[in-house]
């Protein structure tokens, strides 16, 4: 099974929408890989530079209502082709969250107090996810282990590598 985790990128803002994740002008690209350089291009966040800050990151930690806006699957694909396989937030737009699972990626919802704990660990945080146990381990200025909930069907989708792989295996 695929491993989930990596170095964390902190995006300290609520309501990051799919237009900020991947601008609409790039939706006509013919392959997922063609989306890669445009990740978070329109995100306005003090001092954030996607070309500099995304390199080597596998996890995004953010605030509430992540992935709101249009329901484009491209917003998940651009994370996939940039090797980001986990997004951790207080909440997600429903369709974005399901698109993550459908593509075999993790959208982990945590209470605000746990998000605050993660933000408090400093800039150099590494996340490891134990999908079977539904826990994540964050190592930064200290080490914390946080439990999360994931329903069985969505867990099966993620374990299979997404909806298509799950359907091939089960139908």
What spans do the regions from the language model cover?
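N-terminal, positively charged, Ser/Thr/Ala/Gly-biased leader segments
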Residues: 1-24, 165-170
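Feature captures the catalytic cores and cofactor-binding loops of soluble hydro-lyases/lyases
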Residues: 3, 22, 28-133
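Conserved phosphate/anionic-ligand binding catalytic regions in large, soluble enzymes, centered on
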Residues: 16, 67-73, 159-167
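Alpha-helical scaffold segments in soluble metabolic enzymes
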Residues: 20, 38, 99, 156, ...
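Acidic, glycine-rich flexible loop/linker segments
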Residues: 104-171
């Amino acid at each position: 099974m695929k491993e989930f985790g990596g170095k964390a990128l902190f995006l300290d803002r609520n309501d990051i929408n799919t237009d900020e994740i991947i601008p609409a002008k790039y939706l006509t690209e013919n392959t997922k890989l063609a989306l890669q350089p445009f990740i978070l291009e329109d995100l306005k966040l003090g001092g954030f530079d996607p070309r500099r800050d995304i390199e080597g990151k596998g996890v995004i930690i953010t605030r509430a209502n992540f992935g709101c806006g249009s329901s484009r699957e491209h917003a998940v694909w651009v994370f996939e082709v940039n090797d980001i396989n986990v997004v951790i937030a207080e909440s997600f737009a429903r369709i974005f969250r399901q698109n993550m699972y459908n593509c075999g990626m993790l959208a982990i919802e945590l209470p605000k107090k746990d998000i605050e704990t993660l933000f408090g660990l400093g800039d150099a945080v590494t996340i490891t996810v134990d999908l079977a146990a539904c826990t994540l381990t964050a190592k930064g200025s200290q080490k914390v282990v946080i439990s999360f909930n994931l329903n069985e069907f969505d867990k099966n989708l993620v374990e299979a590598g997404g909806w298509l792989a799950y359907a091939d295996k089960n139908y």
